[in-house]
Amino acid sequence: MIIAVDGSAASGKGTLAKRLALHFDLAHLDTGSLYRALGLHLLRSGVTAENAEENKAAAAVASLDLGLADSSEIRTDAVAGMASVIAAMPAVRSAFTTLQRDFATDPPHGGGAVLDGRDIGSVILPDADFKFFIDADLEVRVDRRTRELQAKGQSVIFRDVIEDMRDRDRRDRERTTAP
């Protein structure tokens, strides 16, 4: 069984995906964490959102330490911003597409998988057995993200979270690959 959970930033798709995976004893992949891990890797290498080059970012996928996807460091605004920028790059999306499809069709412990991310149901797994699209009002998503960051001890300015969320939504809507 393959389940795809798609949706906007901070809409709750990760929470739903984790609960489905636990309930049905399926492997889970938060595909956004892959982009965040690559974003963290690039930031550590001195690359910024302003100077990120598509081919270099895509090439970095092959040598990416996937353990970074489990790091708490990927949940910062800087990493989220970088992830949003590189996620708009067709070569980066292509590099991750194979990895995500392989995970879905051959999950770590067999039995099926739940994948969540922004284009999982439409692009990565269009033939998934079950597909969900999760969305919420901007205010609800900003509140969720603010509480998440505060719970991690980060100083948060509500206005900055709103601006960041609007910017991410705009980049997601306007990207030519998997908007």
Question: Predicted segments — roles?
Answer:
Residues 21-31, 47-48:
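Post-Walker A helix-loop "phosphate-sensing" segment adjacent to the P-loop in P-loop NTPases
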Residues 10:
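Walker A (P-loop) phosphate-binding loop of P-loop NTPases
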Residues 34-113, 122, 139-143, 147-151, ...:
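ATP-dependent small-molecule kinase phosphotransfer cores
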Residues 14:
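Walker A/P-loop
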Residues 129-133:
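Short, well-ordered beta-strand core segments
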Residues 3-7:
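Hydrophobic anchor at the beta1->P-loop junction of P-loop NTPases
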